[in-house]
Regions:
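Alpha-helical transmembrane segments and their immediate juxtamembrane cytosolic regions
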Residues: 1-346
Length: 346
């Protein structure tokens, strides 16, 4: 039986599990049915990745940590072993098996394997920002770090928007920024927000326990969904993106926190979500190998599809893909050596 560390927080693992299910659900729609929007994915995408990165930041923050040279190098080395080495191994295997090995595979999306690479970049950026701008852990230093994260997020957001217009003028920089998955840096603000919430968690709980605050957050998220044309107005697209991401993430986090008894190990679905949450890296790395690709011709499905009908179909497929991924992960983890280099296990 798997030994679960006592310091793990059940509802956090369950929330990660839900986020992982939504990622696989999205990939079922994208790779299996040829659409990024069916099955309400156009709504889910507003908070799916923001929630994932928020949790990553929340878990990464540690009160009292001093970013001296030894801590910085040790942490970056540790994250490199966990995030980059397994990703390189699985990505190369995937590219070879599916005959996709060419230079374009190492662009911003990396055939789907961008998440762990970008998360490593977030760790490095955050660590360096804290070490250089907030060594005394002051309010001023905290603001400086926030400004850096916000500017990076805005720059990446608008780079993605205007990429096709200016790509030809970037020359070599286009390839460098693609290799670094710079367009994905737009989510770094949610990673920072996770660290900020963890640092000020008591205040966060006090605010989100207020029914009026949660009502406003739900209203903001709903407004952006109901009036999507707001997103197309020049100059405020980023504000809408930020509000949707933050409100959606806070709503999800608060729901799991305030209903944590339902997501504990005392319930069957709580145990299931926590298991998925503890194995998000394994599932992420493996699931591309077992996704059902090209289930139907995209134009056929898009012509006759129905969102409500699609949801149970895609969820069943998503759970099946996750189950197979967990079984494969369990086989690999029999070997401590493979567990270390394939999944960053200690």
């Amino acid at each position: 039986m798997e030994q679960i560390p006592k310091n793990r927080i059940g509802y956090i693992d369950a929330l990660r599990g839900m986020a992982m299910i939504l990622v696989v659900y999205f990939h079922i729609a994208a790779y299996g049915f040829g659409s990024y929007e069916i099955g309400y994915n156009d709504i889910i995408e507003r908070f799916r990745m923001p929630t994932f990165f928020f949790i990553s930041g929340w878990l990464f923050y540690k009160a009292g940590r001093i970013w001296d040279r030894q801590t910085i190098t040790g942490m970056i080395r540790k994250k490199f072993m966990v995030q980059i080495i397994p990703t390189v191994v699985f990505m190369l295997l995937y590219l070879v098996m599916f005959n996709l090995l060419d230079v374009t595979s190492f662009g911003s999306d990396k055939k789907g394997y961008w998440f762990t690479v970008v998360l490593f970049e977030y760790f490095v950026i955050y660590i360096l920002a804290e070490a250089l701008l907030n060594r005394r852990d002051s309010a001023t230093g905290e603001i400086h770090v926030f400004v850096i994260m916000l500017l990076l997020s805005i720059a990446a957001f608008y780079y993605a928007k205007y990429y096709t217009r200016y790509a030809a003028e970037l020359g070599t920089w286009k390839d460098i920024l693609g290799f670094l998955s710079f367009v994905k840096i737009r989510h770094i603000i949610f990673f920072w927000f996770g660290t900020f919430v963890r640092k000020h968690f008591d205040r966060f709980i006090y605010l989100t326990d207020n029914r009026y605050v949660t009502a406003v957050l739900i209203g903001l998220f709903a407004a952006i969904i109901v009036w999507p044309t707001v997103l197309s107005v020049n100059g405020i697209e980023y504000i809408a993106y930020l509000i949707a991401g933050l409100s959606g993430t806070i709503i999800c986090f608060t729901y799991f926190r305030t209903h944590q008894e339902y997501f504990s190990r005392n319930t069957w679905y709580g145990r299931g979500l926590q298991l998925i949450g503890r194995r998000t890296l394994d599932i992420y790395l493996i699931h591309y190998f077992v996704l059902p690709y090209n289930l139907v011709q995209p134009e056929v499905w898009l012509q006759y599809h129905h969102n409500t009908l699609f949801v149970p179909i895609a969820l069943i497929l998503a759970f099946w893909v996750i189950l197979i991924s967990l079984l494969i992960s369990s086989l690999f983890r029999v070997s401590p050596l493979l567990a270390k280099y394939l999944f960053g296990a200690k």
